[in-house]
Amino acid sequence: MKFFIKNVLLEEEKSDCIVIGVFEFCEFKYSNNYLNKSICSYINNFIKKGDMQGKVGETLLLYDVPNVVSKRILLVGCGKKNRLNRYYLDKIINKSMKILNKFSIKNIIFSLTEINIENYDIYWSIRTIVNSINKYLYKNFKINAFLKKEVYLNSISFHIIEKKDFHIANNSLKHALAINSGITAAKNLADLPPNICNPLYLSLQAQKLSEKYKDKIHVTSIDIKEMNNLGMNAYVAVGKGSKNKPYMSVIKYSGINNTEQEKIIVLIGKGLTFDSGGISIKPSNNMNEMKYDMCGAAAVYGTLIAAAKLNLPLTIIGILAGCENMPGGNAFRPGDIITTMSGKTVEILNTDAEGRLVLCDVLTYVQRFSPNIVIDIATLTGACVVALGNHFSGLFSNDDQLAYALEKSSRQTNDKIWRLPLSLEYEKELHSNFADLSNVGRGKAGAITASCFLAQFSKKYTWAHLDIAGTAWKSGKNHGATGRPVELLSQFLLNESNFLKF
């Protein structure tokens, strides 16, 4: 798929279809730089007759419009003026793409970038539209590949009216395509079946990044032998029941113009390629979805791809913490006491609370990099899904400034997060009579007590935890990975690197 920015007279541009937005209860008006008066009058006739009312997602396909070189114009309803937001825009793009695909259209021009989207300028309009298009294309290409159907669409252009906006629009498109490459990579990795995507496979995918981006990315793979030597006993314990041994990939991205004084940002992704629950085995219902317990690692993988394509002037260390939690003769048990890499001891009360055991050793391991910021991303708790549902990821942090920066990135991208508390009252729930900590709380607020557990191992640096258990994938009709929070993390890195949109 090719994308372009164009500053041309729409009626003179050749394409299979021009997509134009129409507001509800509004006369269609375009300046001479868009379409001339006779074309606007022609379109207004359909609006006056009631063929197009402008309701969100409503469409009307026009053929052979007088004085227009393109073969078709697709009118798409944008709802009430000044109320068009990202949610509605997503619906509009989805409906438009369905119509375009139905008629085997190969190249299109989107003129929606001139429509006023709530709180968005031209930069964010294009970012948002590209993101919506890629969401549709990802799903559609997968279905067509399965059904062995041809995909026709191969070129999308964005029309802008002001030449002064061309550089901004071009930058936006570059950013959008880089970030969406990361989102797609994360989805592709997460959607793989667990008999293919095991910890070794995850490690090999990381190695391929060093081959593809050899001037920017260096990868080190740490196997179970080295983990044992490092004292990562909690991490190793989780993988003991499986024949697929754990692998941890350390991916170092060194961006352009980075110096010794640059911030070092560490991203840690929980990579449980399958989580049966271990001895504390999960119910069989929906256990197939536990292949998605590595979506944190997939998100880190995708974010590093985006960073490499954006050439961000940062030093980023990504950790893919690959492991598989299975029952077996060597599996760890409820009642076990494990000495973590930090020296703290943990009493195991539930082997299905395994992600925090993997992460606690990784959080200790990354101290060697003297990081300025550490963010871990994990499908950590079902309790977070109960608290926030499937729309918001949970945010926990020991630093208000970092939490604010992540919340800002969330607002910019609409990749929603909600901050939850960390406090001593909740830490008391992790009390053990036999060890420093137990691996689960004894009361309620499971997402918070899990984060309090992680906080015990992240006191030496600025840290945040994203619980993506409710947002990493969708069930039901649209079953599949979402690629979240790659866009949020990529925007956070853009903001940290002061990569201005202009």
UniProtKB/Swiss-Prot annotation:
Q: Which gene encodes it?
A: pepA
For the biological process aspect of GO, one term held by this record is: proteolysis
**How is the cofactor bound, in the record's words?**
Binds 2 manganese ions per subunit.
What the entry lists under Gene3D superfamilies is as follows: Leucine Aminopeptidase, subunit E, domain 1, Zn peptidases
| InterPro entries xref list | Leucine_aapep/pepB, Macro_dom-like, Peptidase_M17_C, Peptidase_M17_leu_NH2_pept, Peptidase_M17_N
- Active site per the UniProt annotation: 282, 356
Please report which protein family the annotation says this sequence is part of.
Answer: Belongs to the peptidase M17 family.
NCBIfam families the UniProt entry points to: PRK00913.1-4
Q: Which UniProt keywords apply?
A: Aminopeptidase, Cytoplasm, Hydrolase, Manganese, Metal-binding, Protease
- GO molecular function terms listed in the Swiss-Prot or TrEMBL record: manganese ion binding; metalloaminopeptidase activity
The protein's name is Probable cytosol aminopeptidase
- Reading the lineage from the top rank, the first entry is Bacteria
Q: Which Pfam families does the record match to this protein?
A: Peptidase_M17, Peptidase_M17_N
Q: Which reaction does it catalyse?
A: Release of an N-terminal amino acid, Xaa-|-Yaa-, in which Xaa is preferably Leu, but may be other amino acids including Pro although not Arg or Lys, and Yaa may be Pro. Amino acid amides and methyl esters are also readily hydrolyzed, but rates on arylamides are exceedingly low; Release of an N-terminal amino acid, preferentially leucine, but not glutamic or aspartic acids
Top EC category? hydrolase
Q: Which residues bind Mn(2+) 2?
A: 270, 275, 293, 354
Where found, per UniProt? Cytoplasm
Query: Quick one: which residues bind Mn(2+) 1?
Result: 275, 352, 354
What does this protein do, in the record's words? Presumably involved in the processing and regular turnover of intracellular proteins. Catalyzes the removal of unsubstituted N-terminal amino acids from various peptides.
Q: Name one GO cellular component term.
A: cytoplasm
Its Enzyme Commission number? 3.4.11.1, 3.4.11.10
